[in-house]
Amino acid sequence: MLICLILISLLTVSGLSLSYLFAEDESLLWRLCAGSVVGSVIFGLVCFVAACLFGFTVPTVLISVLLSLLPLILFARPSNRANLLATWEKAKANLQGADFKKILSFAYYFAIVVVLWLFFDRAMFETKDGIFTGSSHNLGDLPFHLGAIYSFTDGQNFPPENPSYAFSKFTYPFMADLLTAGFVRLGSSVRDAMLAQNVILGFSLVVLLERFTFKITGNRLAGKIAPLLLLFSGGLGFVLFFKDFFQGGKDFFQFIYNLPADYTIHDNGIRWGNALTTLFLTQRSLLLGMPLTLIVLQKLWELFTAEKNRKNEPQINPDEHRENTQHSALFRRFACRNSAADSRSQLGGFICRERVFILFQIG
């Protein structure tokens, strides 16, 4: 588990450095969560290319980790270091002076982490009798994911083929399993790698969805409710649950620890799938894909709302605009001649100008 946490922390800091290219007014928590997603994607892409060329070995994975940390050179720029320091100071200021609102917010995030940990802890566990899962929905998916992971670590399955069907293309989004395989190759156990990855990506999804909802609605309460609706969604299975509880004559905890039926997918054919049990547990690639999509959607929303605000601004006098354009052209020619010798400044300027394009390429 320690190996996984160290690797994920390094990738998170690397991804955090990239967040300053496309996000200006976000909190440290948001940047850490976005960084864990972006850093994982970069590591997965680099590791995939390197494994296809040189094989999935320990040196290959280590070099992939080092290459994934290259975005940290962005902090060589004083402006980026200043932004990081400002974000850190703002985070420290928010933690000072505990009040009911801050305690409630901390309890919200802490409770979600505990729930995710307890839930994903049952995704896979090993005993002397073999490998088991705590959910019947995962009986088919867990062997599939294990097959994918071990096909990378033990079978050198590059370019990837479907581990279930020989000589067929691997059309399933395998990036999450490739990340797990990378952690396993560096010494982690499969269970620890899956658990750490699932919990951190799941929490990142919660934070990113909360912020995205707030951006759209402008309501912080809606932002807090949206992740709860996602995680604890479902149908009317709770009606059958309480019906059996009141008819059973047992106390609540005795009943909850000895459930007579599965109330998400019932034996009578009624299927009320929950996002946790039927999506994030079984189709674990969603834990990587959904938060990455939210990052892109939030940026799109910001771009569209900014364009709308620009349309509402007062119109510029045409003569003034022509004069400003001429001045801008002269300035651009002057700037190009004076910056030709400074390739680092040019590269930094390109990254700043094209940060949205770079974000879309990562997506």
Predicted regions mapped to residue ranges:
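Membrane-interface alpha helices of multi-pass inner-membrane proteins
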Residues: 51, 277-282, 323-363
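Membrane-interfacial, low-structure loops and terminal tails that flank and connect transmembrane helices
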Residues: 79-101, 305-344
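Membrane-interfacial loop-to-transmembrane alpha-helix junctions, especially the N-terminal start
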Residues: 24-39, 104-105, 221-226, 342-349
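Transmembrane alpha-helical segments
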Residues: 11-18, 45, 205-213, 292-304
